[in-house]
């Protein structure tokens, strides 16, 4: 065995011993709710397709029309020949929905964050980031030479202290947070963060991947508050409630113009395929016209938390923290045998000691299935959580 294979094998053996090795299981979703895994048909509570739009006829028809008219791929970077008119139309729609001046489409949410952050801050700058922020926000900080300070989850007092102590020593400051936290389902205290950031001349960026389409009348986490706070940098993805693929940033026109000329993940990545832009536009049509659809995922999550006697869900994401890897793997297998797919979440995705079942509720889940799920989950929960 050569040194490369030996290295990989040793890493895999260590992960296997700690119950942290991950493997891909072939699966396919039939209709946005039901999924076939290893030949077994399961009701999924793991998918981020919150509005069940991946199989919606309007999205499929829009994508098919775009493929037949424009082809499958963009063919080049947006700065070369990949800037299809549908992308600019989508940017205008997203900016209007999010209440910003302009928008920039990226190839994926991960590409957005790893492009935006190093474009904005560098050697003489400061980044503050929530300890539970998504991995791609942390990845973006690693691509910048800026000084990074991590603050305790949603801890306003620590943010205030860090900025009061450090802000004067840096040229610019950027605060990074999720709008809706992907593993905990709670919302960031955006009004308080916005006020502190304004006071200290710190730029606030919210990753709203799990907010668009399901929170704040579909406009995202900023609009969950009244009045909506000013968030100068609103990032998100097109792969969750939108049902497709891609990422975006909504911001002022000067910021967006800077992204389109300097963000490396725009400049050096092929543009988003026209079909994905077309399906995203169809999704926005539905989000803007069907308020009942938008409300349903959160209502379903709250039906689940009410049945279990938990605090009301703040988003379609509900975690049940079991602690150990062994406990969460066993619980996931129990749910599997009962016909439910609920993916166990283990470190390093979540901190050590907080392995959990992560439930994602969609518009299509039926009340009777949610109540049945809750009844199966109840005996699996730690006593202190009941």
From Swiss-Prot:
GO biological process: biotin biosynthetic process
The keyword Acyltransferase is annotated on this UniProt entry: yes
Pfam families per record: Aminotran_1_2
Binding locations of substrate: 22, 29, 134, 349
Superkingdom of source: Bacteria
Single GO MF descriptor: 8-amino-7-oxononanoate synthase activity
Entry's family note: Belongs to the class-II pyridoxal-phosphate-dependent aminotransferase family. BioF subfamily.
Protein name, UniProt field: 8-amino-7-oxononanoate synthase
């Amino acid at each position: 065995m050569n040194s490369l294979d030996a290295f990989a094998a040793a890493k895999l053996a260590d992960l296997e011993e700690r119950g942290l090795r991950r493997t891909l299981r072939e699966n396919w979703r039939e209709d946005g709710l039901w999924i076939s895994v290893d030949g077994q048909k399961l009701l999924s509570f793991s998918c981020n397709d919150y509005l069940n739009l991946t199989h919606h006829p309007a999205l499929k028809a829009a994508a098919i029309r775009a493929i037949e008219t424009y082809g499958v791929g963009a063919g080049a970077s947006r700065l070369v020949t990949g800037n299809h008119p549908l992308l600019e139309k989508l940017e205008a729609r997203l900016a209007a929905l999010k209440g910003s001046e302009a928008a920039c489409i990226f190839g994926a949410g991960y590409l957005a964050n790893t492009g935006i952050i190093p474009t904005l801050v560098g050697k003489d700058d400061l980044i503050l980031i929530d300890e539970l922020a998504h991995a791609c926000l942390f990845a973006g900080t690693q691509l910048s030479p800026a000084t990074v300070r991590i603050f305790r989850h949603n801890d306003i007092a620590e943010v205030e202290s860090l900025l009061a102590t450090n802000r004067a020593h840096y040229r610019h400051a950027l605060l990074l947070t999720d709008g809706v936290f992907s593993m905990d389902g709670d919302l960031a205290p955006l009004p308080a963060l916005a006020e502190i950031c304004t006071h200290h001349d710190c730029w606030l960026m919210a990753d709203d991947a799990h907010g668009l389409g399901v929170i704040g009348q579909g406009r995202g986490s900023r609009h969950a508050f009244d009045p909506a706070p000013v968030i100068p940098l609103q990032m998100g993805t097109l792969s969750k409630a939108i049902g497709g693929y891609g990422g975006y940033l909504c911001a002022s026109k000067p910021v967006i113009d800077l992204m389109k000329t300097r963000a490396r993940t725009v400049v050096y990545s092929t543009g988003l395929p026209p079909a994905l832009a077309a399906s995203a536009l169809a999704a926005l049509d539905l989000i803007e016209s069907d308020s009942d659809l938008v409300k349903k995922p959160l209502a379903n999550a709250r039906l689940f938390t009410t049945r279990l006697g938990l605090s009301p869900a703040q988003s379609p994401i509900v975690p049940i923290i079991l602690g150990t890897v062994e406990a969460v793997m066993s619980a996931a297998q129990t749910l599997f045998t009962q016909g439910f797919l609920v993916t166990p979440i283990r470190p390093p995705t979540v901190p050590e000691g907080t392995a959990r079942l992560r439930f994602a509720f969609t518009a299509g889940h039926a009340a009777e299935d949610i109540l049945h799920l809750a009844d199966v989950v109840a005996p699996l929960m730690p006593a202190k959580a009941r």
